Swiss-Prot record:
Keywords: Coiled coil, Cytoplasm, Endoplasmic reticulum, Lipid droplet. It is found in: Cytoplasm; Lipid droplet; Endoplasmic reticulum. Plays an important role in endoplasmic reticulum-associated degradation (ERAD) that mediates ubiquitin-dependent degradation of misfolded endoplasmic reticulum proteins. Involved in inhibition of lipid droplet degradation. Involved in stress granule disassembly. Residues 357-439 form the UBX domain. The keyword Zinc does not apply. Gene3D superfamilies: DNA helicase RuvA subunit, C-terminal domain (1.10.8.10), Glutaredoxin (3.40.30.10), Phosphatidylinositol 3-kinase Catalytic Subunit, Chain A, domain 1 (3.10.20.90). It comes from Xenopus laevis (African clawed frog). Residues 303-348 have a biased composition (Basic and acidic residues). It holds the Pfam family UBA_8. This is FAS-associated factor 2-B.
Amino acid sequence: MAALEERGLSQDQTEKLLQFQDLTGIESIDQCRQTLQQHNWNIETAVQDRLNEQEGVPRVFNTTPNRPLQVNTADHRVYSYVVSRPQPRGLLGWGYYLIMLPFRITYYTVLDIFRFALRFIRPDPRSRVTDPVGDVVSFIHLFEEKYGSTHPVFYQGTYSQALNDAKQELRFLLVYLHGEDHQDSDDFCRNTLCTSEVTHFINSRMLFWACSSNKPEGFRVSQALHESTYPFLAMIMLKDRRMTVVGRLEGLIQPQDLINQLTFIIEANQTYLVSERLEREERNQTQVLRQQQDEAYLVSLRADQEKERKKKEKQDQKRREEEEAQRKQMLEERKKRNLEEEKERKSECLPAEPVPDHPDNVKIIFKMPNGTRVERRFLFTQSLSVIHDFLFSLKETPEKFQIVTSFPRQVLPCLPSEEIPVPPTLQEAGLSQSQLLFVQDLTDD
């Protein structure tokens, strides 16, 4: 299995490759792989196509012809049971036999020559399989019309499907090839195959597939199993990991004799199925154990991944918080620096403080938000914006503030607004020569 996986095959393709090899008996792994690849790894069509490899039959893919792919029929341990036709009895019987013998020889010789010559003129239509399931279903309908509904349960599918199901279910598969032109076929179907005891025995012990050798699907199976006479039965099972013919029953066999022969074949080969069933259970248990280990590993892996994810998420969150704090700090520092530069610029732009004896002097005492007092002289003719710029230039002054008179209490319009585009002068604002003003902090607002 490891060697196959090294060839670049998936587990599903490896299983199909081994199953195809079991069904067809091909020894070459490379040949099996090539055939499956030609059929896009469809094992059913691959088996059907390989069974089509008979002389004069076109294949789906035009590849180099190889030996026909068949179920293993060369096992030297295969059990074979042939029922010969009864010998003539008495003088009358022998006389009739000797009289008819030349006619039989002549008839079958001419028939064989005719069929042989016909092959050169027109290929055997049975060699072209176009609807294998239809061939099987058609035979079942004709069988029931002629022999009734009491019969073993027919497998309604192709031969390769029956092989595959028998392998998967570890069951025996009994294959019946019906020779419509054979003199014993009608007797076998009526008096052996359709009896209640044979029907019950087959239904309870095995799968049953049947088709007429005159149908393309039946003819193809006939070419694979190489029957010598009719009625023909073949018992197939999974043996040594290959679908193998373990029993062949040919001739007009009686009901009880058929049951006895099938029982003998089953008992002689049951150990192979038991062994395969134990091996399969062991493989299933190993697979279940491996699956449980894989699931446990996946659970552990997911837990580790979740742990790693949370750890990374926490690290990312911490990094984002640090970056955000650093960004805010930089913004705060830049804002502080810009504020200091603005204060310095306002301070440089302030008009000089008037002398104490100037007639338009206004002495203003500012009470700061921190409780300290600041005193400065201004002129009545100066704008209230000069007062605002002076206070703004002071280090202890907050970034945002307003100037309020004590009585009557009012906010001085020191900055331009929609209502007052140009701030008034100190005189227009009604300030006296000595004035107390309050500076209110608006930073939090």
